[in-house]
From Swiss-Prot:
Belongs to the GatB/GatE family. GatB subfamily. SMART domains: GatB_Yqey. The lineage of its organism: Bacteria, Pseudomonadati, Chlorobiota, Chlorobiia, Chlorobiales. Keywords: ATP-binding, Ligase, Nucleotide-binding, Protein biosynthesis. It comes from Pelodictyon phaeoclathratiforme (strain DSM 5477 / BU-1). Allows the formation of correctly charged Asn-tRNA(Asn) or Gln-tRNA(Gln) through the transamidation of misacylated Asp-tRNA(Asn) or Glu-tRNA(Gln) in organisms which lack either or both of asparaginyl-tRNA or glutaminyl-tRNA synthetases. The reaction takes place in the presence of glutamine and ATP through an activated phospho-Asp-tRNA(Asn) or phospho-Glu-tRNA(Gln). InterPro entries: Asn/Gln-tRNA_amidoTrfase_suB/E, Asn/Gln-tRNA_Trfase_suB/E_cat, Asn/Gln_amidotransferase, Asn/Gln_tRNA_amidoTrase-B-like, GatB, GatB_C_1, GatB_Yqey_C_2, Gln-tRNA_amidoTrfase_suB_CS. Pfam families: GatB_N, GatB_Yqey. This is Aspartyl/glutamyl-tRNA(Asn/Gln) amidotransferase subunit B.
Length: 475
């Protein structure tokens, strides 16, 4: 029997707010354990939560970006369960009345554009963190307790593991473009649970699903879903029954393992939090946030093609990340040459970022200085070959390209007399190749150009070298 995969994702996006969701403690990642805490984080008696306004605005922002309906009235609820890193014994979340509902995310997993529907986006707080790798003890770090999250819940519209990965990457791109999260999966800023089931092809009823947790990369999302598909298929083909459960992905072993039986909503005994008033969003707030939304990747790529006359492929690559697109546009503003700027950003800049494991925000060469380097090529001050040397020196020193060119004496030689002297010396030193060229082996022109450029240490104007060579070779 042939089966169809059905996947829905629950994505937890950690917001990059300065303070936590319901108190004034810092939400910054990486601090010493249990230092970013207060009576609210620790659930001490009498401590009352106060909702961070920025969390509401970020939720509305993401809702508008994904075409959701924004609820004018939504409610914060208590999700009750026991876990050592949840000191209150409940998590503040939303249930029956989320702030955003019925949205859409567009993906392309290689088979054309697909629309993945969203059930809801809701506000919740993160739990603390259990640490198991210090001796035989388990420790609790509550720095993360109360850090604001948005949970993005999709309909089960995904049909392959690649679509699931593409969807998660798209969500990450959206939240990064909006500036509400860094989307760092390694640090837990973006986490994903996958609800996976199989059903016979042609059936409309869903099969029993399992929830997969602990997937900390796009590749692991694909691998975990693929593994679970095969596990389900083997059980079904053997006449077995799929258990509704939560399973953990073990990346080292390449397999999932049972964690617990999958809970239903009623297991959490949701009810409105009596310590928090309803969340009210008026039309004025919606209109203001809508007016502040950035230009999104697809729109920006179309504009790049129209405005800068660069290929659609270049535009798509340059707009994957907002910061890279900004960097490109600033370099074009200075260089005046969009295609050259595109080539340099996609080539040399991205090479360095990849080799050094850096983000564009950490790149040492400012976009206006890259633009200045490209402008020097356009003005004939330096050749492209010399420009690459200058680029490496800029990486080390951070100096402006014009300063480096002057200091290192790298300006291009355009003195026709000096070039003619070198060309004549090369021709005199290679009589055999000269005779062969004049005998019809015109491909030897490249040999003579190379010799001349080598003699002048790459600083000769290539166009002038070609012109002088051709005149003398044909003479």
């Amino acid at each position: 029997m042939k089966y169809e995969l059905v996947v829905g994702l629950e994505v937890h996006c950690q917001l990059n707010t300065t303070s936590k969701a319901f108190c004034g403690c810092s939400a910054k990642f990486g601090k010493s354990a249990n230092t970013n805490v207060c009576p609210v984080c620790l659930a001490l008696p009498g401590a009352l939560p106060v909702l961070n306004r920025r969390v509401v605005e970020d939720a509305v922002k993401l809702g508008l970006a994904t075409g959701c309906s924004i609820a004018p009235h939504s409610v914060l609820a208590r999700k009750n369960y026991f876990y050592p890193d949840l000191p209150k014994g409940y998590q503040i979340s939303q249930f029956e009345e989320p702030i955003c509902s019925e949205g859409m995310v567009h993906i392309d997993a290689g088979e054309g554009n697909r629309e993945i529907r969203l059930i809801r986006i809701h506000i919740e707080e993160d739990a603390g963190k259990s640490i198991h790798d210090i001796g035989e003890e388990t420790y609790i770090d509550l720095n993360r307790s109360g850090v604001p999250l948005l949970e993005i819940v999709s309909y089960p519209d995904l049909r392959t593991s690649k679509e699931a990965s593409a969807y998660l990457q798209k969500v990450r791109q959206i939240v990064k473009y909006l500036g509400i999260s860094d989307g760092n999966m390694e640090e837990g800023s973006l986490r994903c649970d996958a609800n996976v089931s199989l059903r016979p092809v042609g059936e409309t009823e869903y099969g029993t699903r399992t929830e997969i947790k602990n997937m900390n990369s796009f590749k692991n999302v694909e691998k975990a879903i693929d593994y679970e598909v095969e596990r389900h298929r083997e059980i079904l083909e053997a006449g077995g029954v799929i258990l509704q459960e939560t399973r953990l992905w073990d990346a080292d072993k390449g397999e999932t393992r049972s964690m617990r039986g999958k809970e239903f909503a009623h297991d959490y005994r949701y009810f409105p939090d009596p310590d928090l008033v309803p969340v009210l969003v008026d039309q004025e707030m919606i209109d203001r946030i809508m007016s502040e939304l950035p230009e999104f990747p697809e729109e920006r790529a179309v504009r790049f093609v129209d405005e800068y006359a660069i290929p659609a492929y270049d535009a798509a690559v340059l707009t994957v990340e907002r910061e890279v697109a900004d960097y490109f546009e600033e370099s074009v503003r200075v260089s005046g040459d969009a295609k050259a700027s595109s080539n340099w950003v996609m080539g040399e800049v991205m090479r360095v970022l990849k080799e050094s494991y850096l983000d564009i925000a950490e790149f040492s060469i400012l976009p206006e200085r890259l633009g200045g380097l490209i402008a020097l090529i356009g003005k004939g001050v330096i050749s492209t070959t010399i420009a690459k040397q200058v680029f490496e020196l800029m990486l080390k020193s951070g100096d402006a390209p014009a300063e480096i060119v002057e200091r290192e004496g790298l300006a291009q030689v355009s003195d026709s007399g000096a070039i003619e002297t070198v060309v004549q010396a090369i021709l005199d030193a290679n009589p055999g190749q000269l005779a062969a060229y004049r005998g019809g082996k015109t491909k030897l022109l490249g040999f003579f150009v190379g010799q001349c450029m080598s003699q002048m240490k790459g600083k000769a104007n290539p166009q002038m070298v070609n012109e002088v060579l051709l005149r003398k070779l044909e003479g």
